[in-house]
Amino acid sequence: MSEERELLRETVAALVEKHASPEAVRAAMESELGYDPNLWRLLCEQVGAAALVIPEEFGGAGGELADAAVVLEELGKALVPTPLLGTTLAEIALLSVGRTEPLEELAEGAKIGTVVFNPEFVINGDIADIMIAADGETLTQWDTFTAQPKPTMDMTRRLASVIPGATTTLGDDQGLADTAALLMAAEQIGAASRCLDLTVAYSKDRVQFGRPIGSFQALKHRMADLYVKVASARAVVHDSIATPSSTSAALARYFASEALSAVTSEAVQIHGGIAITWEHDIQLYFKRAHGSAQLLGPPREQLRRLEAEVF
């Protein structure tokens, strides 16, 4: 990771630590907007989070996809609900067809964007100002639309069912779903990493039979296996983002989804019954794991895509 990108990561991590405590995350996810507008403003003003993938001539930071991935990975660690994923994808879609008019307001965070892959489950669909539909062949802007929030298992990710009204065809879809898969994989890796950290910390504090449960060899082995799984998945995701393609996107999503699901499942087992209580954060990571795995195609679908490359 470059020095500039590491500085970006540290800046986001500091903001998250200060403004996105578990209590703040819960308050944000239960709010009318589904995110904390003050934190969103700080991310846009101090980090330029919504401007990272936009060229400087259009009011952006002139960064790369990997920069946005770094921010999403840090936000994923604390399950911070923000409009960043959808807004970034909308910006990439608009840039791919040369439609630059909305970019300045998106970069400032004044407007929220999102992308429709499945109209029944649109990220931040009920709060978006700019909505782009991608069907694998064509990008279409939904100039008017009706959105209905959907009840979700993962309350940290706002989803809505959206029906289009007036639409405008923008141009060819150059693989926006693959870009979305890469960014979501980065977010998943962040969540997996933090969930594992929380589990290790708990195993050191929880005493049973007169000693911390983390000192028992069976649990040591399980957590060591999880560490390898997360580290391996992170390497795959980072390499995939550096060399994006349809194949690398499927790889990233498969490994990230499997890693997060494995970590959260073991976290529930190691924590015991407390993990599934509303007051404990592990249940939020468990729900994020299974909710995210179903968006943009579940792991088995990614595996089928990879198999098609071989057979």
UniProtKB/Swiss-Prot annotation:
Record note on disruption phenotype:
Deletion mutant grows normally on glycerol but shows impaired growth on cholesterol. It accumulates 5OH-HIP in the culture supernatant.
Q: Which reaction does it catalyse?
A: 3-[(3aS,4S,5R,7aS)-5-hydroxy-7a-methyl-1-oxo-octahydro-1H-inden-4-yl]propanoyl-CoA + A = (2E)-3-[(3aS,4S,5R,7aS)-5-hydroxy-7a-methyl-1-oxo-octahydro-1H-inden-4-yl]prop-2-enoyl-CoA + AH2
Quick one: which residues bind FAD? R206, G273
Give the top-rank taxon of the lineage listed in the UniProt record for this protein.
Bacteria
Question: What EC number(s) are associated with this protein in UniProt?
Answer: 1.3.99.-
Q: Which PANTHER family match?
A: ACYL-COA DEHYDROGENASE, ACYL-COA DEHYDROGENASE FADE28
* Protein name, as recorded: Acyl-CoA dehydrogenase IpdE2
Q: Which organism is it from?
A: Mycolicibacterium smegmatis (strain ATCC 700084 / mc(2)155)
Protein's gene: ipdE2
